[in-house]
Amino acid sequence: MMQGLRELWGKIQYNIKRVMDSDPAATNVWMVIWTYPHITALFWHFFAHRLYKAGWPTLARRIALHSRHVTGIEIHPGATIGRGLFIDHGMGVVIGETAIVGDNVTLFHQVTLGGMSSKKTKRHPT
């Protein structure tokens, strides 16, 4: 568990640094932590993804639903998210179950990484 918390803290620090380096409107660390919704969404996704992989999909989806209501950003617990994802003006961003988002990706509002297939196959972008 401690390793997981260290990993979470490392990802949060990396993401905050990425925002500070990328967004001139980000004037301090506390502003990023408290007012950038994607930081909150990524925090909840960290836990939801682990629950999803551990065989607890309903609880994972419930956490993801809470995150969506709070942030306006929908990240399926099955999605794989790399380090340094920056979702600027994130309202309406949707990242689907089989999507793989690499390191240091920037997304803006109203982006959907989704698919239309009802088959249980890879159906989201990588």
State where each predicted segment sits.
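Flexible, glycine/small-residue-enriched loop-and-beta-strand segment within the central core
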Residues: 53-126
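Terminal amphipathic alpha-helical/low-complexity segments used for targeting or macromolecular assembly
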Residues: 1-67, 71
